[in-house]
Swiss-Prot record:
Organism from which the protein derives: Xenopus tropicalis (Western clawed frog)
Keywords tagged on the record: DNA-binding, Metal-binding, Nucleus, Repeat, Transcription, Transcription regulation, Zinc, Zinc-finger
Stated name of the protein: Zinc finger protein 574
Gene Ontology cellular-component terms listed: nucleus
Signal peptide boundaries: none
Function: May be involved in transcriptional regulation.
Pfam families: zf-C2H2, zf-C2H2_6, zf-met
Keyword Zinc recorded: yes
């Protein structure tokens, strides 16, 4: 046969009769044939003299089980796997504790299966070696099970269960002759089937010789017997009790225990009394069945009595002094009852065996943890040399080394704790922070968590560490976005209750934290602490890009966004980004065709009416827009703090302690507010002086040409972040500052202030040389620049004609235009016309001369 040829095999299944060897193509035909052998299939070990055999018994060819109908046999055959069925892969072998059968040497991994298997050997021995004798009236069946037929009584069975009201009702049986008795060897009860009279079914109860506990089935009895022994003792002792049968009494008459003839067994102990099972109404004076339990052994220490010497010995161990160790493992317990409770874990099904020492464990995790003890080096080793088998204890030990200074030991720690004494007031005072604690435990906890800098709670998301677990749980809400605490006034939600309480102060207006230097109040203690840095010039937060210092961390964070040009809040419609979320929400109103809600005092826009109501405008003040005026120069400011700062910065030479605001807050000198007097910071390039370091740093960018704030839209850079903020409104088209008189809007507040002076006619900026006044400071600065140029020209008369520098014209328009507003013209009364003027320094595009206002000085 070549390799290319295919071989087809036809397999035909046939069923062979186990009695005569005939073959049949189907199981149904084989079952019908076996009906002829039904009489021959009757097993003599189950046949009792005088009892007719059952008809139509069908035996399973796999396990030999007898069934009554073919349908039952077919249903039973489905439980056996066929040969063509794919075998499941075997589980990997693991260390298990097996139970060995002493008869056939079979191994079982479950105690229940082992007990059930041992019971099968007991049945075979009972049937093969014992005599089967039937008694119809007064005789006894000597097969290991007693058969009793009571007189005609109600069909009830009374069990000795401890509950006198517990009983089981069974239907009465008829249609069977009085001599036909069926004994069911697979159960612990017998069936009396009599004809013409009712017969009660009585259960055979099994009594433990050690603890006098009762059981209904041999399996439960044998399993319980195994709990009184361990190891080989359990198996050997169980063998001695397998063939013993419980003792029953018929009509109150005690019987001797019946032992199977074929087995060599030991008798029950003398104190093992018989169980009395009687029908109801048989003995009126007895309300319930009792079992004689006479304590014969007493303890000499506590006079407690016991039924067996084993119980007495176990009890006497409890009077000994601990510790007690487990005989199966190395665990130690302070009392013996705890050892007994621990031994129950070893009696359970421990299937995980240690190959090194032979100890068994319930779970694989416990076994792996135990096997670390057999390693040469333990798994968890600390830097100080200590080793741990348990990870939890190792982590707890590492807390000792978490502080900056190493721990010197438990002895020194106890000395430190003992040396702490309460103050005369009864409190424990903390020197670093000044807090008082009523209890020593609270004081030590404060020292450990606050001043030891021990942060052992780590966030799994960002890796940040916290001192307390509650702080970590609050921090985790920032990653999930959950805000479970909401304000009942404005419906704002917060991720912690502390933030909610701080927010409520904005509704009540309460500011409990007040600065002692300037009188300014704050709602949070941290804000007051940061404010005090201003007085002491303590700017702790420095920008690494430009070197500007800030006294608040969030100011530095907002400042750093200007360097990168990437703002955190981006519009999804047009792609513009914003520094604040409020600005983004106001911008998105324009996409929806809605108008923002604007504050009339300061011109700030808000996305909702509620946000506008929550806004407390500093320009409005408590007096409806009234400002505080400086008594020295007349400048108006919005608050006491601004007035004190202004006086200290601008008028440090005039030390006026009587300058006060409407609230009577005294103005402190400059040296008390900021630790120094006047403008003591000088620029090394131009020798200009400044009052703050921030102002000096911003000024020095003029000399260095540094522009650290680029525009993310066009790339243009600026020296200050405020200039960038104003510039970005050109891209967005936003003009939040609107004139109340004419309705004209501007991008910055300065332009609006200059525009309002047109309506009022106010010219606050005057020239000190000629006395001319201007509406804006920029126009005054440009005007004074001309005076400086005139002085230069007077020093060099030959460079310019003398008659060309006598008059100056200032061009002013209603709207600001990008032109140079100063020109030089000929004196008045000259014959030269306006058209002959030479505009050398004036750049005008698409502007007629009629729109230019020409004036003379």
């Amino acid at each position: 046969m070549t390799d290319s040829e295919e071989t087809v095999l036809y397999v035909e299944h046939r069923y062979v009769c186990s009695e005569c060897g005939e073959e049949y193509p189907s199981l149904e035909e084989a079952l019908e044939h076996q009906q002829s052998h039904a009489a021959a299939l009757q097993e003599p070990q189950y046949q009792i003299v005088g009892v007719n055999s059952l008809e139509n018994q069908y035996q399973c060819l796999e396990c030999g089980l007898l069934l009554r109908t073919p349908e039952d046999l077919l249903a039973h055959q489905e439980l056996h796997p066929t040969q063509n069925e794919i075998q499941k892969p075997k589980r990997p072998t693991r260390s298990e504790i097996h139970y060995e059968c002493p008869e056939c040497k079979a191994l079982f991994n479950s105690q229940d299966v082992w007990m059930a298997h041992r019971y099968t050997h007991m049945q075979v021995q009972d049937v093969s070696h014992s005599k089967i004798v039937l008694q119809t009236d007064d005789h006894v069946i000597e097969d290991g099970l007693q058969l009793m037929c009571a007189p005609a009584v109600p069909s009830e069975v009374h069990l000795v269960t401890g509950d006198p009201h517990f009983h089981v009702s069974t239907p009465s049986s008829a249609s069977v002759s009085h001599t036909q008795v069926l004994v069911d060897l697979e159960h612990s009860y017998k069936k009396n089937e009599g004809a013409g009279e009712d017969c009660a079914m009585e259960l055979l109860l099994y009594k433990c010789s050690e603890c006098t506990q009762l059981f209904q089935t041999p399996g439960e009895f044998l399993e319980h017997q195994g709990t009184h022994f361990s190891g080989q003792e359990r198996i050997s002792d169980t063998n001695s009790h397998l063939d013993q049968t419980p003792q029953l009494s018929l009509n109150g008459q005690e019987k001797e225990p019946i032992i199977n003839q074929g087995n060599t067994c030991t008798d029950y102990q003398a104190e093992n009394k018989e169980l009395l099972v009687q029908p109801e109404g048989e003995q009126a004076e007895q309300d319930s069945w009792t079992v004689d339990r006479e304590p014969v052994f007493s303890c000499g220490d506590c006079s407690e009595t016991f039924q067996t010497t084993k119980d007495l010995e176990e009890h006497q161990i409890s009077h000994q002094n601990g510790p007690f160790s487990c005989p199966l493992c190395s665990k130690v317990f302070p009392t013996y009852p705890e050892v007994g409770e621990h031994l129950k874990s070893h009696r359970s099904e421990s299937r995980y065996l240690c190959v090194d020492c032979g100890l068994a464990f319930v779970s694989e995790a416990v076994l792996l943890n135990h096997r670390r003890s057999h390693l040469a080096n333990p798994l968890f080793t600390c830097e100080c040399g200590l080793t741990f088998l348990n990870m939890t204890r190792f982590l707890y030990h590492r807390r000792v080394h978490s502080s900056k200074q190493p721990d010197t030991g438990a002895v020194e720690e106890k000395k430190t704790v003992n040396s702490i004494a309460p103050s005369p007031a009864g409190n424990f005072h903390c020197d670093p922070c000044g807090k008082d604690f009523p209890l020593l435990s609270q004081f030590l906890r404060h020292q450990r968590f606050v001043h030891a800098l021990e942060r052992r709670h780590k966030c799994p998301t960002c890796g940040k560490h916290f001192k307390k677990g509650s702080h970590l749980r609050t921090h985790m809400l920032t990653h999930t976005g959950e805000r479970p605490y909401s304000c009942t006034v404005c419906s704002k939600s917060f991720n912690s209750q502390a933030n909610l309480l701080r927010h409520r102060l904005t509704h009540t207006g309460e500011k409990p934290y007040k600065c002692q230097l300037c009188g300014k109040a704050f709602s949070q203690s941290s804000t007051l602490q940061q404010h005090q840095y201003v007085h002491g010039q303590a700017y702790l937060y420095k920008c690494n890009e430009c070197g500007i210092n800030f006294h608040r961390p969030y100011r530095l964070l907002l400042h750093q966004y200007h360097h990168t040009g990437e703002y955190p809040y981006k519009c999804q419609d047009c792609g513009l980004s914003f520094l604040l979320k409020r600005l983004l929400e106001v911008h998105q109103l324009g996409h929806r065709g809605e108008e923002p809600h604007r504050c009339r005092e300061c011109g700030t826009n808000f996305p909702s009416v509620q946000r506008l109501q929550d806004h407390r405008c500093s320009k409005a003040g408590d007096g409806g827009g009234e400002k505080l005026e400086c008594p020295i120069c007349g400048k108006k400011v919005t608050s006491d703090a601004h007035l004190n700062t202004h006086v200290a910065a601008q008028h440090s030479g005039n030390k006026r302690s009587n300058v006060s605001s409407g609230k009577g807050t005294p103005v402190l000198p400059r040296n008390k507010l900021k630790g120094g007097g006047g403008k003591n910071l000088e620029c090394s390039d131009c020798h200009k002086t400044f009052s703050t370091e921030t102002s000096l740093q911003v000024h020095r960018r003029i000399h260095t040409g540094e522009r650290p704030y680029p525009c993310p839209d066009c790339g243009k850079a600026f020296r200050q972040s405020t200039h960038l903020k104003d510039h970005r409104r050109l891209h967005t088209g936003e003009k939040p500052f609107k004139c109340d008189v004419c309705g004209k809007a501007f991008t910055i507040a300065v332009r609006l202030s200059e525009h309002k002076r047109i309506h009022t006619g106010e010219r606050p900026h005057s020239c000190p040389d000629c006395g001319r006044a201007y509406r804006s400071f920029s126009n005054l600065w440009k005007h004074r620049k001309l005076h400086r140029e005139q002085q230069v020209q007077l020093q060099e008369p030959e460079s310019q004609p003398a008659d060309l520098s006598s008059t100056v014209a200032i061009l002013e328009t209603v709207e600001t235009i990008p032109i140079i507003e100063t020109v030089e013209i000929f004196p008045e009364g000259s014959t030269i016309s306006v058209q002959d003027i030479q505009f050398e320094t004036l750049q005008v595009e698409n502007i007629h001369l009629g729109n230019i206002q020409i004036g003379t000085l």
